[in-house]
């Protein structure tokens, strides 16, 4: 029977899916005074882990989070004023919150290799935004025996996971791919990925199971 592999930094508890970690997150040192800003925007739950890593405590600051998992991480960290985006694609989320950020001084905690045009859209829209690189995805070297066998179904959760999978294992034309979103799908242009309707790991897994 074909196997489903989740290529992601986020693991699933679903025992029918193999977790494959080809990337790891490194948090970067920075200093920031949250009280200098009117809002915090985040496109990953790693933003809150980066705040914790740097010993920065939550304050009564509105947070604009890209999706439910990101909003949950904000709440768990200690923020209470949280706007959860209706759009889980970076570019669409930027356009959604742009009118809400006009006239505000905004902080954006981002990854080193952000795949979307999120920051550029807000900047061109006239938002006063300060971007801080708070974390980065680095290659997690894997042994070749971990390479998925032929005809496996691979779920990719980000563009960097595609690149790091290729660095570790190369590619097999028999693989079937599922992408969590549009930007990741572009990175999979050498295959024909199915794009999940919902930018959520569980939704991707449900889609993968329809292919078994």
Roles of regions detected by a PLM:
Residues 1-212:
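Signature of uroporphyrinogen-III synthase
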């Amino acid at each position: 029977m074909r196997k489903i592999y989740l290529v992601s930094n986020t693991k699933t508890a679903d025992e029918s899916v193999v977790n494959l970690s080809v990337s790891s997150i490194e948090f970067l040192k920075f200093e920031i005074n949250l009280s200098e800003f009117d809002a915090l925007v985040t496109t990953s739950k790693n933003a809150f882990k980066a705040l914790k890593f740097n010993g920065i405590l939550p304050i009564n600051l509105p947070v604009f989070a890209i999706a439910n998992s990101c909003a949950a991480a904000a709440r768990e960290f200690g923020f209470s004023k949280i706007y959860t985006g209706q759009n889980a694609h970076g570019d669409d989320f930027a356009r959604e919150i742009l009118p809400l950020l006009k006239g505000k001084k905004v902080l954006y905690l981002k990854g080193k290799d952000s795949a979307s045009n999120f920051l550029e859209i807000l900047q061109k829209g006239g938002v006063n935004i300060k971007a801080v690189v708070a974390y980065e995805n680095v290659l997690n070297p894997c042994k070749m025996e971990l390479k998925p066998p032929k005809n496996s179904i691979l779920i990719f959760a980000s563009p960097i996971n595609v690149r790091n999978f290729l660095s570790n294992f190369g590619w097999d034309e028999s693989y079937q791919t599922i992408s969590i979103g549009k930007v990741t799908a572009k990175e999979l242009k050498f295959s024909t990925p199915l794009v999940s309707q919902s930018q959520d790991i569980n939704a991707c897994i449900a889609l993968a199971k329809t292919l078994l």
